[in-house]
């Protein structure tokens, strides 16, 4: 089972996203603070992160940069910040995608599926090439 970390400070939205992900067969960790997200990331095998930009204890951009220094894990931003410079900052921080709210859960689930399949395929090629 692939595990997704949801870092979203709006509790109701966090719960709704987590519910949809669980229903789609993913293992899910939902947190509302960046520091709790870091702790959860360190303690668990996380395969993808859904990340808000505006968090009570910091900006998602710095969290994404921190994650990328730990190991390569795909990050998708989910945010109300729809300015071009925010999206560019999101990609520059290392994210695979930048999705603005409101969003379609069906489309988000498809994006997650595509990214996880691409990541698994790349990891398989690396493993095969090394042996």
Summary of predicted features, one role per range:
Residues 119-131:
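CheY-like receiver
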């Amino acid at each position: 089972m692939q595990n997704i970390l949801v870092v979203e400070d709006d509790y109701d939205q966090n719960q709704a996203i987590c519910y949809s992900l669980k229903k789609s067969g993913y293992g899910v960790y939902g947190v509302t603070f960046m520091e709790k997200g870091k702790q959860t990331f360190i303690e668990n095998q996380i395969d993808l992160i859904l990340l808000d930009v505006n968090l009570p204890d910091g900006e998602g951009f710095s969290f994404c940069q921190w994650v990328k220094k730990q190991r390569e894990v795909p990050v998708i931003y989910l945010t109300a910040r729809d300015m071009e410079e925010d999206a560019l900052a999101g990609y520059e921080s290392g994210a695979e995608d930048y999705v603005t709210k409101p969003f379609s859960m069906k489309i988000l689930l498809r994006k997650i599926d595509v990214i996880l399949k691409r990541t698994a395929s790349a990891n398989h090629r690396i493993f095969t090439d090394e042996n």
